[in-house]
Design a protein with these regions (language model features):
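Nucleotide/phosphate-binding catalytic cleft detector across ATP-hydrolyzing
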Residues: 1-159, 167-286, 293-341
Length: 341
């Protein structure tokens, strides 16, 4: 982009758990999708990482809000404020003029027209002049390096914070797909519930996420076993500190009921897929993206379930953001981008 360009282009992965912003092919913002507000004044106290540090530690006059739930906007005003604040963190120009903003934002493939409108309105209120949107499975496929416009089938499973999206893509379109509200946030809750029920220890979301990242597993026979996780928390009966050691096998057990739903959604898409595209998937395999792709052994589990090869996309946490950035560079080429003139 030239020095005198009046259009600033941002690719945004507006996720339930994290929001990523890419400018000039680089991730310039990667922060939790959370905002802290002062209740009486409505003033923004913190956004992103700083707000996440406050979560669970605030007094009654400050509230932390996660504006997105299950991949869609749950709080319009908070989303607008969060987006505006995160965009301000993008130091992209030294010009004395404020450039117009063009955004490409990824959204769940099951989004309703009302939900799509809410994303567009939030972007426009945050300063966007021109807004394009791309469905998350398409962005994940682009970010995984797949040719989404080729006359052959490609399959992606994008496991984010609020939703898991499973889609078969061919010729620039989503042929068949499933979107379920079983993803990272549900896995975190599963771990909280397990620790409470099995060990009588109450843990917060942040601790459960630490456990998930350290020993989260989809199968109980990993080739490389992670070290056990030592946890100290308040016993629910005595309120005294209690220490337990958690193994990855326990977490695999804790996640099992949710993972069975993911298995079923995958099989539903495979069963509804045209035979010609199925043959392509047998050859090309399935690509995993999103934070959930980092659950240990998930690729092996899904491969065993489907009988198909399963690959983890490079840097799966940023695959959707990468794909959104690729879409930004090709807004005039990709006919599958949604845009209101």
């Amino acid at each position: 982009m030239g020095f005198f360009s009046l259009m600033q282009e941002l690719a945004i992965d507006l996720g339930t758990a994290n929001t990523l912003i890419i400018y000039n092919g680089k991730v310039v913002v990667d922060e939790p999708s959370i905002i802290a507000l002062e209740l009486q004044s409505g003033k923004v106290k913190a956004i992103g990482t700083e707000a996440k540090k406050m979560d669970g530690r605030v007094h009654p006059n400050i509230k932390t809000i996660r504006p997105l739930k299950d991949g869609v906007i749950a709080d319009f005003k908070a989303t607008e404020l969060m987006l505006r604040g995160l965009i301000k963190k993008v130091r992209t120009t030294s010009s004395m003029f404020s450039p117009s903003l063009r955004m490409v934002i990824c959204i769940p493939s099951g989004s309703t027209n009302v939900e799509i409108r809410a994303v567009r309105d939030s972007a426009e209120h945050a300063g966007a002049r021109d807004v394009y949107m791309i469905f998350e499975p398409m962005a994940a496929a682009l970010g995984a390096g797949l040719d989404v416009e080729a006359p052959e089938g490609n399959m992606v499973i994008d496991i984010g914070g609020g939703t898991s999206e499973i889609a078969c893509i061919s010729l620039g379109g989503i042929v068949c797909s499933e979107s379920i509200n079983v993803a990272g946030d549900v896995f975190t809750t599963d771990i909280q519930n397990y620790v409470r029920q099995q060990h009588n220890i109450r843990i917060g979301e942040r601790t459960a996420e630490e456990i998930k990242h350290a020993i989260g597993a989809a199968i109980s026979d990993l080739d490389e076993e992670p070290e056990d996780f030592v946890l100290t928390g308040p016993n629910m009966l005595t309120a005294l500190p209690q220490t337990v050691t958690l193994s990855y096998n326990e977490i695999a057990y804790a996640l099992e009921k949710s993972l069975v739903k993911l298995d079923a959604a995958l099989m539903t898409v495979l069963e509804t897929m045209p035979p010609e595209l199925y043959a392509d998937i047998v050859k090309n395999g399935i690509y995993l993206a999103g934070g959930g792709a980092l659950i240990k052994g998930l690729d092996k589990r899904l491969s065993n379930k489907s009988g198909l090869p399963v690959h983890i996309a490079e840097d799966p946490l940023r695959a959707v953001a990468r794909g959104t950035s690729i879409a930004m560079k090709n807004v005039d080429k990709f006919s599958f981008l949604m845009h209101d003139n």
